[in-house]
Structures are given as structure tokens and as C-alpha cells.
Design a protein with these regions (language model features):
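Acidic, surface-exposed loops and disordered segments
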Residues: 1-231
Length: 231
């Protein structure tokens, strides 16, 4: 698979087969992914790769919060959007509507919507998760937050997601996976000096589930670009 095909066929996977990904495969993907560029080659990332009993332990740590609906304990390490510009809201709502329609979740069915949110928090029962962390002292600076490690980690994440199909794997860059970072931190003994940025769900896609057939739309180039100095 060449890079054009990898980019053009990439999609978010939300249903996985139970088969774990071999460690050797994950190591090869991550080794290649670290060729991502970063500010002055700072490489401000750390991988935490989880599967098997430890991943199940993280899910169990989330259960009390889910059962008691302790939303106040859902405090990700990074600030979440408080509101969206109108255009972003439309895009977000369009995707959500598509997912719910494919999964047969009616607009007024709050119970099913809650169950879907729980599935998100539990990482859709994926066999492996790659957590991406960055150094807290590099993110928080005297004059405010330094956004560049987030940008750099984004380049790294894209590499992982584009490499995965070469091995028959699918991925989802999941914010839900890190909505309760303390649960992850406590189970895996991640120090407070490491901020948990994102969780990449990685596994073998279950293409029998129609949710994996969703291909979200993109605005045409002429709508999102301005050109100067060209004929």
C-alpha cells in the first residue's frame, strides 16, 4: 500500500475483532512512526502500550465512575473544547448523526446513547491501546501553555494510523480513552509528570459491523484554501 492509498482509505474504526496485535507488529509500527518531525527534533512523546489483563484492569477502574455517573471525575489532562464555531458544530453533529443511524440509535433513545458513550470510554473493547504522553513541564511554560508538543504528537499519531493498514490493522484516535486519565495513571503507574494526550485504539477491524463502513466527508479544497501568486 503506497502513501496515497493509505491516506485515501484511512477511516476511524469503532468495532474490532478480539485478536490481540502481536508485540513485534506494534514495535515495528512505532519504530517507523517515530520518524515523524518535531520542533528542533525534541521528540516530545512517550508510548504506553497496553493489552490483555492490564487493559481490562483499566476498564474495571472506570466502572465505578460509569455506574455512579461521576462526571466530575472525568477530567482529562488537556483542556477540552467548551464550545465550537458553528461550522465545526455542523461537522461534529453530522458525524454523530451518521454513527447513530448506522448503529440504530434513535434520536430520543437516551439509554442507547448512554450505552454508546460507555462503549467509547471502554475503548470499544479493542485488544490494544497505545497511549501517547508528553512531558508536563514542557507543556506548561511561564508565559502559558506550549502547544507545539501537541502538534508534534499529532504528526506522530498520523504516522501510526497510516502505517496500521499495512499490517491489516485499523485505528481510532480516541479522546474518550483518556477522559479519565487518573484511572489509566493509577493502573499503569504513570507519573504525574507525564500528561496523557490521546489513546490510539489499534486492532483488527470487524468489517461485519456497519459502523466501520462510515467514511466521513471532507470539504472541497476550494472551500478551505486561499491562493496567492498563482495564475
Amino acid at each position: 500500500m503506497d502513501i496515497v492509498e493509505a491516506i485515501n482509505t484511512r477511516r476511524s474504526i469503532r468495532a474490532f475483532k478480539p485478536d490481540p496485535v502481536p508485540r513485534q507488529v506494534l514495535e515495528e509500527i512505532l519504530e517507523l512512526a517515530t520518524r515523524a518531525p518535531s520542533w528542533s527534533n525534541t521528540q516530545p512523546w512517550e508510548f504506553i502500550i497496553v493489552g490483555g489483563p492490564k487493559l481490562e484492569e483499566i476498564k474495571r477502574a472506570l466502572d465505578p465512575m460509569i455506574e455512579k455517573k461521576e462526571i466530575s471525575r472525568i477530567r482529562p489532562d488537556f483542556i477540552m473544547p467548551q464550545k465550537y464555531p458553528d461550522l465545526y458544530t455542523i461537522r461534529k453533529q453530522t458525524l454523530g448523526k451518521t454513527v447513530f443511524e448506522v448503529k440504530g440509535i434513535e434520536r430520543g433513545n437516551k439509554e442507547k446513547r448512554v450505552l454508546w458513550s460507555i462503549q467509547e470510554l471502554r475503548c470499544f473493547d479493542v485488544p490494544n491501546v497505545i497511549y501517547i504522553c508528553t512531558d508536563r513541564s514542557y507543556y506548561f511554560q511561564e508565559r502559558g501553555v506550549n502547544v507545539w508538543p501537541i502538534f508534534d504528537c499529532g504528526l506522530l499519531v498520523e504516522n501510526i494510523m497510516l502505517l496500521a493498514p499495512k499490517y491489516g490493522l485499523g485505528t481510532l484516535a480516541s479522546v474518550a480513552a483518556v477522559m479519565c486519565p487518573d484511572a489509566v495513571r493509577n493502573v499503569l503507574d504513570i507519573p504525574d509528570s507525564s500528561m496523557i494526550l490521546i489513546g490510539i485504539l489499534i486492532g483488527y477491524p470487524d468489517y461485519d459491523d456497519p459502523v466501520n463502513q462510515i467514511r466521513s466527508a471532507r470539504d472541497p479544497l476550494e472551500k478551505i484554501s486561499r491562493w496567492y501568486g498563482f495564475d
